[in-house]
A protein has these predicted regions:
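Intrinsically disordered, metal-sensing/regulatory segments
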Residues: 1-253
Length: 253
């Protein structure tokens, strides 16, 4: 394997390992009061929504359009991404536990949430690796978007498990094991991508569709629940900052 050919492997595995480490963020919030945690998660969710939409519209879709015209194939890929994430949310009950739900998710949901989170992380690994197969800058931008989304997500997952009766150490362990499934997703795409050169071009619009769905269906509706002017302004600032960070990553190209 040449040095250039090894770049997607090196960067992909480093990135998914970093994403897996994010699952241990529960350590940083164990001592926080529930009210402070709610406020923090709402800010992180707003930033995450901006980052996901920014990656979709500033990085992924322009990259896909450069490789091929914006036709039915790309539109179909975007819609397929939206559909798959909708099905995961609908039938596997994977969803993004927001600030309003910390400490309120039913105990029966915890095990199902772990399964859904594992599938979610598998897809995260696949889309990160698929992005690196296209280019290193695109992979870095997608990794940042995934990380920004994972931070509030993992805090919510940690809260669900603790509320379900898991000890904090056990909750962190299961969160990390679920997050590590991203490594498997990345390896699968890297192995298959070597045999199917067009795979990465299919994953890019799929990823964009998934990011648009997550931001539009899960994150932004969560932000709309906040009606107080001051906190709404903070959320807007977080959302815009997420967009700006993604725009700034354009200069990596």
């Amino acid at each position: 394997m040449s040095l250039d050919a090894s770049f997607p492997w090196i960067f992909s595995l480093m990135s998914v390992f970093l994403v897996s480490i994010i699952s241990l963020i529960g350590l940083a919030v164990i001592s926080m009061s529930e009210e402070r945690l709610r406020r923090l998660v709402l800010i992180l969710v707003s930033f995450s929504a901006g980052a996901l939409l920014g990656d979709a519209f500033i990085h992924l879709l322009p990259e896909a359009a450069e490789e091929s015209s914006f036709g039915m194939e790309m539109s179909g890929g975007i819609l397929f991404g939206i559909l798959i994430f909708f099905v995961l949310e609908k039938f596997v009950h994977w969803h993004h536990c927001g600030a309003a739900e910390i400490g309120e998710c039913p105990k029966a949901f915890a095990t199902t949430n772990l399964v859904g989170d594992g599938l979610h992380n598998l897809i995260d690994g696949m889309i990160i690796a698929g992005s690196y197969l296209v280019s290193v800058p695109l992979g870095i931008a997608t990794t940042f978007a995934v990380i920004f989304h994972e931070i509030p997500q993992e805090i919510g997952d940690f809260g669900v498990l603790v509320h379900a009766g898991y000890t904090k150490a056990r909750a962190l362990k299961f969160n990390f094991l679920c997050a590590s499934v991203a490594i498997l997703g990345a390896v699968l795409v890297l192995l298959i991508g070597g045999q199917l050169p067009g795979l990465s071009q299919l994953l890019i619009p799929f990823t964009a569709g998934g990011f648009i769905y997550i931001a539009g269906s899960d994150l932004i509706p969560e932000l709309q629940k906040e009606t107080r002017l001051g906190r709404s302004a903070i959320q807007l600032a977080g959302f815009l900052l997420g967009l700006l960070v993604m725009a700034g990553l354009v200069f990596l190209a």
